[in-house]
Each structure stands twice: as structure tokens, then as C-alpha cells.
């Protein structure tokens, strides 16, 4: 077997996650610069960053897709996935976290934890991703390292441990004190490549000694070996302390915190050291679980050994203008050579991988083989989708699936010419394959093509890509809300479908009971067979369930999909000769529609979690405006010692179209907002009446 350049214990698969403006992409850029991966510093404001390579990202200065990039530091290979911080793109974050081993959470040292940081943090908790934190923007007015750390405790319930003390802050920020070695590090040149080690400034010695005490006490709380030395008041060797920090970080017991200013080129090299020292290699992570593809039951653990069977998870698909379809995959075990065949065990299809590439934003490096621990691009797969499992042998094993949220907002799009029509279909196929939170379908009533996604910005960027990348001219309709329907009361009804038209007839007779299920729970539908004594033969029960499921796609009020309903089939009858699956399916559909009409059907609307960050003087106007949009104000908070306030509210999506523009005008462009889906709730009666009267 070929020697691998970087043994698996020297690989780090990490993500960089943060709120939209915490400086995450700049931090990634500096990492690439100091690791020698790129030779010139990139800046987001100038559109010269390496990882923001889509046109829309360069224009908007926000990261939309997770760009995969490799960097090399102190004999280690670091595979970095730069993830978007905007809530409309949480699907990108979700699928990146699924395949990562560790993450750097970047925060703005002036404000600490912001709304989107909470969302991303919870996602990382769900996938048990070990983290280190970087308090960025220490040069910013109002930056306060220890206040920002406190917000991690208060808002995230995290256990952050400061490994450094900043030397100065705001314009006076010069460097950091390393609390493990008790050395002061100063960045003395403009590009931040020269680091001088000096003794700690005299005015900081006492403070740093007390903070080092805090650090040791905090590590002792989570590590028995350090606790023993601590109790005996023995000197704790730095390497032992590092080892304990590493173990506790990998077990997610602590979050080591560092600080710096990526934009001013200070603090990035110690962050890279921390990635190597404290974040896990693929060997440190719990094994990935494989399940039976049919029953969903756990079968075995997949261990990260190169000589095992090949298993990988496709976590992202991209349409590349030069090579066609590119599949990003995380290899969990085994080895694969280019030109090999793989089995897509999710779809039970065999495909050939023609080429293998390591990715560097939109550049690629071709390789002959890939191994356990790699994050890689596969070229040549035509039928593989996001979330599919790939193996080198036929088996019925699949890795844990990726879950994606339902879209909440839609627009109609229509091609301007006949020529555009064919191109639009192709564009939509490619884009929906690339982004599982995007759906497109044809509305049978109107014949319109509908595009659905996670928010206004999400759809705006997709439409921009349709026009720019796929050269399709489209007209776009007004945004629409993805309403749903449900019921409030239990009821019963029967459906009889009898047809006699010469020869064999049709006969199906069903009695159903419906009742509401709790809203916003994981169960959106429950079907229960309560037939006794064979009044309806077993073989017709699936047809009854299908009849109900199909009817649920088209609610009785406004034709929206129905959710949160339990259906029980409890009686009926059949005919020896004339009964068929078709007849029972139709009878079930009739009974269901009838039962729903008697069960007090209601409309449901998506409600969004809205967080507005605004200077205090505009707070009154912002609150009044949110209230006028049927918003419920939940709380306010101050942003660490500044006159900035954050308003937290719940507002129906239907009231938020164009909100960003209104909010900017209310605050003279100084407020920012974060809007993300929260839950569905019942539409008030007067609003329902308005919607019904429009139909």
C-alpha cells in the first residue's frame, strides 16, 4: 500500500462557523496565507477572497456555499470547510457539520454571541462537533475579550476557557499573552508574519497569573489527572496541561478560546496551533454508524481504517462549468483508486469514479487515490445525490442520513422565451440537486413553475444564478408563503365508492376517524389500522393509507398540504368480486375529505424568529413596526457596554416581505436583522377570512 503523505492522525477536518459579520471568511483567508496556500492576502471588501468564489459572494461579501480548501501547518493537513453565516443558508452549515471532526467558532469580540451564532452552535451540538473559539476583531471599538467569553456562557451554556489574554484592545491591540507558556506574542510587521516573543508587560503580570490560575482550575474540573496535581499544589507541566485540554475539547467538555484580529493580521498562527493541538483527527472521533438500508436498524460501526471496506458519504453536489457534476464526499473508511467503481448503497446503483480531486475553493489537485479521513471531490458520478452512501462492494448498509428542512417561501418563475424554457428546466435540475433545501415544481392549477426555498435572500441568489450562470431570462412573481392546513377537532366520516358499468364493477367502503396531533412535532401524520374481523381484507389497507396521504396534499380550505393529523380506519365493507385497491383508495379519499370538513379545519402559517440589532435611538420605531406586522416582542438585550440593542421577536413570514428595506430606512441603514424559520402556528380568523376571500 502506498505511504500516505499525511498519516490519518495528522489530518484535521474542520469547519469555520460564525455569525454573518464576525469575520469568518477573512479568518479563513489569513489561515490560507500563513500556511502558504496562497501568496497574497485576500480581503472580503475587495472581493479578492479565495473561498468566496461565486460571483454573488464576491458582490455581496457573504459566504453562500461551503467552499472546501486544504492548508498545511506543522506537518499536518487541515481540510477546511468555510460555511455561510446567513440563516437562509443553514442547510450548507448543517451538511458541513455532518462530515467535520471539529470547528473553529468565530465571534466578534465587541458583541460576542449573536443570533446566528446560537443557531450554528446548536447545530454543532447536535452533531457533537468539538470546537475552539476565536474572538476576532479585537481592534474594533468596544472589543472586550472577557465580556465576549461571558456571552458564550450566558447564551450558549458553553464552558469556555481562555487560553490567552489580549495585550491592549481596540486601536491599542498589539498581541496576546499565551497563558500556557506565559509568553507575550507581538505581531511586528504589517502582514503579521513576524511574531516576537517577549516577557509579559509589567502591568499585566498579576492579571495573567490570576487568569492562568483560572485556566488550570477550569481544566482540573474536567480532568482527573490535572485535578490531582492541582489539589497537591504541584507545578503542572505545560505538555500535561495541553494533553488535558485536548482530551476535554474532543469530549466537548470545554471550548478553548483565543483572540486576535484577522483583518489586522494578528493572532492567526496561535489559532492554527490550537487546531493541531486541540481539535481531533479522524481517529479521535467516535465511529460512524451504518444502518440497514431497508429496516433502518443499526448494523455496525465503521472504523477509520485504510484497509477496511470503502465507505463515504456524499455531502454536496455541484455543477461545475468545466467538468460537469462534482460530488463532495467524506471518506470514513478504506481506500479508493481513481477509475474504480463504487456502489451507491442508498440507490442500489453502481457508478464509475473517473477522477479524484482535492479541492482548493474553485481550483483542484488531481490525485490517484483517496483514503479514510479525506474530504474530496469525485468526478464521474451521475446518479449520486446529497446524503447518499458510497461503498466499494454491494451491501445494504447506509450511513446516517442528512436531514433537510422544508422550504417556507415560494415564487413563481416563468421563462421569457421558448429558448429560455428548455434552459430553465436544465438549470432547475442542477440547482435543486446542488441544494436540497430548494424545491421546484409545476403548479397543476396555474401551470406556473414554482421555486421554494428558505428565505428571500436564498431565492434572490438562486434566481440571480439562473440568470447569470445558466443564461436564462426569467420573470419572477411575488413571494408566497408556504401555508399548511390542519384540524382542531376529532371527527368521523365514511366513504363509499361503487361503480357498476357492465362487466366487473368497483366497490370500496371505508369508515375513518381523524383527530389532531400536536403541532410542530416530528410526527406530521399517523395512520392506524383498527379493522377487526376482516371487514376490510388486509391487502386493501395500504391503498386506504395511500388514498389518505394523497388527499392530505390538497387541504379543504385553500388546497395547502395538511399536517398534524392522526387517521384511524375502523370499519367498512368489501365485495368479493368488485373490490380493488383503486376503489378503496378513492373511498378513503372521500371519507377523509368529509371527515376533515367536520373537524374544524384551520390554516397554519410559518412564524419566523426575528432578531434586529439596532442603535438604541431607533429601537422604538423598530418595535412599533414589528408589532404592526403581528409580531410578538419576546425580549431585548444590550450589546456589551455599547448603545446597541438587540430586539428578539416572533413574526409571521407573510408580514416580512421586503422587511430588510423598511428596517434600513427606519434606522438610516444602521440596523441589521437575522430572520429564520421558528415554527408553524394557526392563522388568526380575520387573516384567514382575507385569504379565503382572495381565492
Swiss-Prot record:
GO molecular function: GTP binding; GTPase activity; translation elongation factor activity
Top-level taxon of the source organism: Bacteria
Domain tr-type G: 9-283
Example of a GO biological process term: ribosome disassembly
One protein family per Pfam: EFG_III
Cytoplasm among keywords: yes
Binding site for GTP: 18-25, 82-86, 136-139
Intrachain disulfide bonds: none
SUPFAM superfamilies, A to Z: EF-G C-terminal domain-like (SSF54980), P-loop containing nucleoside triphosphate hydrolases (SSF52540), Ribosomal protein S5 domain 2-like (SSF54211), Translation proteins (SSF50447)
Record-linked CDD domains: EF-G (cd01886), EFG_III (cd16262), EFG_mtEFG1_IV (cd01434), EFG_mtEFG_C (cd03713), EFG_mtEFG_II (cd04088)
A Gene Ontology cellular-component term: cytoplasm
Subcellular location: Cytoplasm
Annotated family: Belongs to the TRAFAC class translation factor GTPase superfamily. Classic translation factor GTPase family. EF-G/EF-2 subfamily.
Function: Catalyzes the GTP-dependent ribosomal translocation step during translation elongation. During this step, the ribosome changes from the pre-translocational (PRE) to the post-translocational (POST) state as the newly formed A-site-bound peptidyl-tRNA and P-site-bound deacylated tRNA move to the P and E sites, respectively. Catalyzes the coordinated movement of the two tRNA molecules, the mRNA and conformational changes in the ribosome.
Protein name: Elongation factor G
Organism this protein belongs to: Petrotoga mobilis (strain DSM 10674 / SJ95)
Gene name as annotated: fusA
Amino acid at each position: 500500500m502506498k505511504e500516505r503523505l499525511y498519516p490519518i492522525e495528522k489530518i484535521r477536518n474542520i469547519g469555520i462557523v460564525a455569525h454573518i459579520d464576525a469575520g469568518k471568511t477573512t479568518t479563513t483567508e489569513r489561515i490560507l496565507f500563513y500556511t502558504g496556500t496562497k501568496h497574497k492576502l485576500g480581503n472580503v471588501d475587495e472581493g479578492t477572497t479565495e473561498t468566496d468564489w461565486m460571483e454573488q459572494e464576491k458582490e455581496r461579501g457573504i459566504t453562500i456555499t461551503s467552499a472546501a480548501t486544504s492548508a498545511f501547518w506543522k506537518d499536518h493537513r487541515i481540510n477546511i470547510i468555510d460555511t455561510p453565516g446567513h440563516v437562509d443558508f443553514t442547510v450548507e452549515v448543517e451538511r458541513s457539520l455532518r462530515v467535520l471532526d471539529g470547528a473553529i467558532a468565530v465571534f466578534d469580540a465587541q458583541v460576542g454571541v449573536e443570533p446566528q451564532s446560537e443557531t450554528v452552535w446548536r447545530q454543532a451540538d447536535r452533531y457533537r462537533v468539538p470546537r475552539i473559539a476565536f474572538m476576532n476583531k479585537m481592534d474594533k471599538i468596544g472589543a472586550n475579550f472577557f465580556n465576549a467569553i461571558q456571552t458564550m456562557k450566558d447564551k450558549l451554556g458553553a464552558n469556555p476557557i481562555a487560553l490567552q489574554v489580549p495585550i491592549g484592545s481596540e486601536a491599542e491591540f498589539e498581541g496576546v499573552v499565551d497563558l500556557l507558556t506565559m509568553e507575550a506574542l507581538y505581531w511586528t510587521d504589517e502582514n503579521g508574519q513576524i511574531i516576537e516573543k517577549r516577557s509579559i508587560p509589567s502591568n499585566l503580570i498579576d492579571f495573567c497569573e490570576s487568569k492562568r490560575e483560572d485556566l488550570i482550575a477550569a481544566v482540573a474540573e474536567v480532568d482527573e489527572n490535572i485535578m490531582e496535581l492541582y489539589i497537591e499544589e504541584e507545578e503542572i507541566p505545560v505538555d500535561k496541561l495541553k494533553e488535558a485540554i485536548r482530551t476535554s475539547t474532543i469530549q466537548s467538555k470545554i471550548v478553548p478560546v483565543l483572540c486576535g484580529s484577522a483583518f489586522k493580521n494578528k493572532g492567526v498562527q496561535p489559532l492554527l496551533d490550537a487546531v493541531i493541538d486541540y481539535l481531533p483527527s479522524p481517529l479521535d472521533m467516535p465511529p460512524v454508524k451504518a444502518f440497514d438500508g431497508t429496516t433502518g436498524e443499526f448494523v455496525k460501526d465503521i472504523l477509520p481504517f485504510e484497509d477496511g471496506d470503502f465507505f463515504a458519504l456524499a455531502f454536496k453536489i455541484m455543477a461545475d462549468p468545466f467538468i460537469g457534476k462534482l460530488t463532495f464526499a467524506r471518506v470514513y473508511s478504506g481506500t479508493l483508486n481513481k477509475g474504480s467503481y463504487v456502489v451507491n448503497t442508498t440507490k442500489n446503483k453502481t457508478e464509475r469514479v473517473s477522477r479524484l480531486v482535492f479541492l482548493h475553493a474553485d481550483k483542484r489537485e488531481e490525485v490517484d487515490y483517496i483514503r479514510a479521513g479525506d474530504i474530496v471531490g469525485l468526478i464521474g458520478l451521475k446518479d449520486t445525490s446529497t446524503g447518499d452512501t458510497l461503498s466499494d462492494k454491494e451491501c445494504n448498509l447506509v450511513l446516517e442520513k442528512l436531514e433537510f428542512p422544508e422550504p417556507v417561501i415560494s415564487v413563481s418563475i416563468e421563462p421569457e422565451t421558448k429558448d429560455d424554457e428548455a434552459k430553465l428546466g436544465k438549470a432547475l435540475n442542477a440547482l435543486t440537486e446542488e441544494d436540497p433545501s430548494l424545491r421546484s415544481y409545476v403548479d397543476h392549477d396555474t401551470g406556473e413553475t414554482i421555486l421554494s426555498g428558505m428565505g428571500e435572500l436564498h431565492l434572490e441568489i438562486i434566481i440571480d444564478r439562473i440568470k447569470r450562470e445558466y443564461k436564462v431570462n426569467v420573470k419572477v412573481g411575488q413571494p408566497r408563503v408556504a401555508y399548511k392546513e390542519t384540524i382542531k377537532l376529532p371527527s368521523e366520516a365514511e366513504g363509499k365508492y361503487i361503480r357498476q358499468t357492465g362487466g366487473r364493477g368497483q366497490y370500496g367502503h371505508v369508515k375513518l376517524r381523524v383527530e389532531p396531533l400536536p403541532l410542530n412535532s416530528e410526527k406530521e401524520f399517523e395512520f392506524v389500522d383498527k379493522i377487526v374481523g376482516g371487514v376490510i381484507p388486509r391487502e386493501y389497507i395500504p391503498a386506504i393509507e395511500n388514498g389518505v396521504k394523497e388527499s392530505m396534499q390538497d387541504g379543504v380550505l385553500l388546497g395547502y398540504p395538511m399536517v398534524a393529523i392522526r387517521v384511524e380506519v375502523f370499519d367498512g365493507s368489501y365485495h368479493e368480486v368488485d373490490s380493488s385497491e383503486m376503489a378503496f383508495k378513492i373511498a378513503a379519499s372521500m371519507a377523509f375529505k368529509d371527515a376533515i370538513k367536520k373537524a374544524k379545519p384551520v390554516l397554519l402559517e410559518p412564524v419566523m424568529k426575528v432578531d434586529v440589532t439596532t442603535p438604541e435611538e431607533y429601537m422604538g420605531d423598530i418595535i412599533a413596526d414589528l408589532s404592526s406586522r403581528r409580531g410578538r416582542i419576546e425580549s431585548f438585550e444590550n450589546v456589551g457596554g455599547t448603545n446597541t440593542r438587540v430586539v428578539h421577536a416572533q413574526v409571521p413570514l407573510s408580514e416580512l416581505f421586503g422587511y430588510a428595506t423598511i428596517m434600513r430606512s427606519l434606522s438610516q441603514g444602521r440596523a441589521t436583522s437575522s430572520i429564520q424559520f421558528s415554527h408553524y402556528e394557526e392563522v388568526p380568523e380575520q387573516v384567514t377570512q382575507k385569504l379565503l376571500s382572495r381565492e
